Each structure stands twice: as structure tokens, then as C-alpha cells.
């Protein structure tokens, strides 16, 4: 059983997430975060990860979208946890909550967007084509099919538009 609980972060709670945001994205101002969080809640939602004492250890933002290849998806734009355990029980708790919510909303897949650092290389031939057009490799997108989802060729990674 996890020591963490996952909670919906309503408009009265989103400002509590800002210290986590600031740690990961130091250039984001408090007002930028509040504006983004308000928009994220209108388009989907924001979940918080709380420890046993109520301390916030992470969050994720999500939206429900339609994908040509995957159908109805639960798109996670930001998932951030601060934990010392390599087993990442906080991340696991957030992912389990996201999956339950996705199933509840009738989604066939979850797309998880993460920064590209450590996952993708700018030097690939496909990436260079986009880089030469002024784009940068910003993120990769991982996809998890939910039971009853559509078939996808798992040999081709699902990456951001910058990958091509």
C-alpha cells in the first residue's frame, strides 16, 4: 500500500504546487503557473501527490484528446515527482490514478509527455531535418494502451511531432 495519496487540485489548491514547478522550471513565474493551471483545469485537470503529512511531492496535468492512431487518449503533459526512493512509489501512485481516471473517461490509451533529455538525441537524421527548419527536440511521448484499446505497431516509438 502506498504512503501517498492522489488528490484533485482544485483552483484553491493549485498555488501550493508552485514550489514544485519552480524547482523544475525556474523561469516560470507564479502568475504563469496560475494561468497555466487554470487552463489545464479547464481542458482536463491537475492531480496532486500528497505524503502522509499532507506535503505535496508531485503533480500531473492532463487533458482528454482524440488521436488519429490511438482514439480517445488521456494526455499527460506534465508529470513531476520529488522522491528519494528509486522504486518511485509516488510516480507509481500518480500513474495508477491517471490510468483509473483514463479508464473512467473512456480513454483507449494514455500518452505521457516527458522532456527529451536522456531519451532522444538531436543528432539523429530524422531530428536534424526538423532542427534545420528551426524546431528543437523538446519532448518525447510515451503511449500506454489500455485494455480494449486499438492495435499499434509497438516497434515504432510514439514520439513528439519534432521526431517526425
Residue ranges and their predicted role:
Residues 113-114, 132-149:
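Conserved catalytic-core motifs of GNAT/GCN5-like acyltransferases
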Amino acid at each position: 500500500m502506498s504512503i501517498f495519496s492522489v488528490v484533485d487540485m482544485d483552483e484553491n489548491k493549485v498555488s501550493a504546487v508552485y514550489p514544485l514547478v519552480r524547482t523544475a522550471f525556474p523561469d516560470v513565474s507564479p502568475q504563469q503557473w496560475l494561468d497555466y493551471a487554470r487552463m489545464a483545469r479547464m481542458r482536463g485537470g491537475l492531480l496532486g501527490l500528497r505524503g502522509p503529512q499532507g506535503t505535496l511531492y508531485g503533480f500531473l496535468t492532463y487533458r482528454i484528446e482524440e488521436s488519429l492512431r490511438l482514439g480517445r487518449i488521456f494526455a499527460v503533459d506534465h508529470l513531476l515527482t520529488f522522491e528519494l526512493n528509486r522504486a518511485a512509489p509516488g510516480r507509481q501512485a500518480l500513474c495508477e490514478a491517471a490510468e483509473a481516471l483514463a479508464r473512467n473517461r473512456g480513454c483507449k490509451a494514455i500518452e505521457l509527455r516527458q522532456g527529451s533529455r536522456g531519451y532522444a538525441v538531436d543528432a539523429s537524421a530524422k531530428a536534424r531535418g526538423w532542427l534545420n527548419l528551426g524546431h528543437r527536440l523538446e519532448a518525447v511521448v510515451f503511449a500506454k494502451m489500455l485494455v480494449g484499446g486499438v492495435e499499434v505497431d509497438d516497434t515504432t516509438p510514439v514520439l513528439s511531432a519534432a521526431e517526425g
